[in-house]
């Protein structure tokens, strides 16, 4: 019976998605709003089921749940709920109000839940592909828009390449370790030097495939184009739930089956983290589109989170999880502001379009300013604490130079975040924006409240992240 309750959230998401798909297909009326609302309820129920699911390993080591997977799954569900709440008015305004949108989000989240809890390379790949197939369609969801079609094609081609590299890496690991089970791989690498050397080669390909999905440099080339070309409601989803799911998987893979060869991959992760922070900071400086700016910003944020992985300690994992949770809130708040940027029901995406917003719409300007300050890491906002925890973990693990580089790139990145604030408060511009929907206002308000008030009660998030990190790092986790 415990096995049933463990997989119940996945069954619930998949069955709910199929029911909504059938209801949309076999009814003549447009039920897109009702299906979107129902999807939000389904995700909330699924999050509750995921928290209540018993821990342990099932299906002969193919699937595992613990405090770490619960933490990541809840973040994924919250990201999807926020993205759906932001999508309703935006999709209607640009003419893509279709019931398939929330259904695809549900199927993508189903894949992410499988992904996060995978304890076998085969399960990992299945979850990876379930997620990817839904995301490919979402990227090109505005099929009559040239930029959206281009974004979908780029994401599909490069995503297929990353999947191929991942699968090739899995085959190499299986060839040298003789198993695809996480516990079996860890045992093989700890006891057989030859297997460790050969499997490390496969690990490089696995790491490349996963780095692509989180937009880590130098595998980031798709991110600015897809962020700009895809509908903003899709971009808001891409920037949150998929990145958290894949990053959680990355933590499990690197510190679980490949934990015994930490010394062989730590330098590579440091290089990827450093490259991501530098490219994210420098690449955004000359951007005029706020969506492309957010694309480069996400590259940098993944670099900071990778510092926690490079530390290879429980404190590093906890710091990375705290950073991801805060990044989730900041991203939803920022994309809520971007979705609210519309005049005459037409989206505006240039940073220059924000000119004069402080006088025309002071509440909007305040929320976006809070998000920008937080992403820049200015105390006492939540973004500062996210960086503080990963920097502290890196320094304690002997990665001082990487932490110093992180501080330098944070200063550089502050330039383009503050430029957005400068445009809103000091430049003259056009009349104000359209009236915001209740869903967008709710997401913006909740994100701003969390970002500002986090300093007064950080213990809840830090305690949960510490429990999750402990579950990942203990020997019984694998």
From Swiss-Prot:
Subcellular location: Cell inner membrane
Alphabetic keyword roster: Cell inner membrane, Cell membrane, Membrane, NAD, Quinone, Translocase, Transmembrane, Transmembrane helix, Transport, Ubiquinone
Signal peptide region: none
Single annotated GO MF: NADH:ubiquinone reductase (non-electrogenic) activity
Membrane topology: Multi-pass membrane protein
Family annotation (Pfam families): Proton_antipo_M
GO biological process terms held by the UniProt record: ATP synthesis coupled electron transport
Subunit structure: NDH-1 is composed of 14 different subunits. Subunits NuoA, H, J, K, L, M, N constitute the membrane sector of the complex.
The name this protein goes by in its record: NADH-quinone oxidoreductase subunit N 1
Gene: nuoN1
């Amino acid at each position: 019976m415990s096995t049933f309750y463990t997989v119940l959230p996945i069954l619930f998401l998949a069955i709910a998605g199929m029911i909504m798909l059938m209801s949309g297909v076999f009814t003549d009326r447009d039920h897109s709003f009702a299906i979107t609302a129902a999807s939000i309820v389904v995700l909330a129920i699924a999050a509750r089921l995921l928290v209540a699911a018993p821990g342990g390993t099932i299906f002969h080591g193919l699937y595992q749940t613990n405090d770490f997977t619960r933490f990541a799954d809840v973040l994924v569900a919250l990201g999807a709920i926020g993205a759906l709440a932001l999508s309703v008015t935006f999709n209607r305004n640009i003419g893509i109000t279709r019931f398939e949108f929330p259904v695809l989000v549900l199927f993508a989240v189903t894949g992410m839940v499988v992904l996060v809890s995978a304890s076998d390379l085969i399960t990992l790949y299945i979850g990876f592909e379930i997620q990817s197939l839904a995301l490919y369609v979402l990227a090109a969801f505005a099929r009559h828009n040239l930029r959206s079609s281009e974004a979908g094609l780029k994401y599909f081609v490069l995503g297929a390449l990353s999947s191929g590299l991942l699968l090739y890496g899995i085959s190499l690991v299986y060839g040298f370790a003789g198993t695809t089970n996480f516990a079996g791989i860890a045992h093989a690498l700890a006891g057989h030097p030859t297997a460790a050397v050969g499997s490390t080669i496969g690990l490089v390909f696995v790491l490349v495939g996963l780095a692509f999905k989180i937009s880590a440099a130098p595998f980031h080339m798709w991110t600015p184009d897809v962020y700009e070309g895809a509908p903003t409601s899709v971009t808001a989803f891409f920037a949150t739930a998929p990145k958290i799911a894949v990053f959680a998987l990355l933590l499990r893979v690197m510190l679980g089956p490949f934990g015994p060869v930490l010394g062989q991959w730590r330098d590579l992760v440091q290089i990827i983290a450093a490259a991501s922070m530098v490219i994210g900071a420098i690449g955004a400086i000359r951007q005029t589109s706020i969506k492309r700016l957010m694309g480069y910003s996400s590259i940098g944020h993944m670099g900071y989170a990778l510092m926690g992985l490079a530390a290879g300690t429980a404190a590093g994992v906890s710091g990375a999880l705290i950073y991801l949770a805060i990044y989730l809130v900041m991203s939803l708040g920022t994309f809520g502001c971007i979705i609210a940027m519309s005049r005459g029901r037409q989206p505006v995406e240039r940073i220059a379009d924000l000119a004069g917003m402080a006088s025309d719409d002071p509440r909007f300007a305040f929320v976006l300013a809070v998000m920008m300050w937080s992403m820049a890491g200015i105390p006492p906002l939540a973004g500062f604490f996210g960086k503080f925890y990963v920097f502290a973990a890196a320094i304690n693990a002997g990665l001082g130079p990487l932490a110093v580089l992180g501080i330098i790139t944070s200063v550089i990145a502050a330039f383009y975040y503050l430029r957005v604030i400068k445009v809103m408060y000091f430049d003259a511009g056009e009349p104000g924006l359209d009236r915001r929907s209740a869903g967008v206002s709710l997401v913006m308000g909740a994100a701003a409240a969390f970002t500002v008030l986090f300093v007064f009660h950080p213990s809840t998030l830090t305690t949960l992240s510490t429990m999750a990190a402990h579950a990942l790092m203990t020997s019984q986790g694998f």
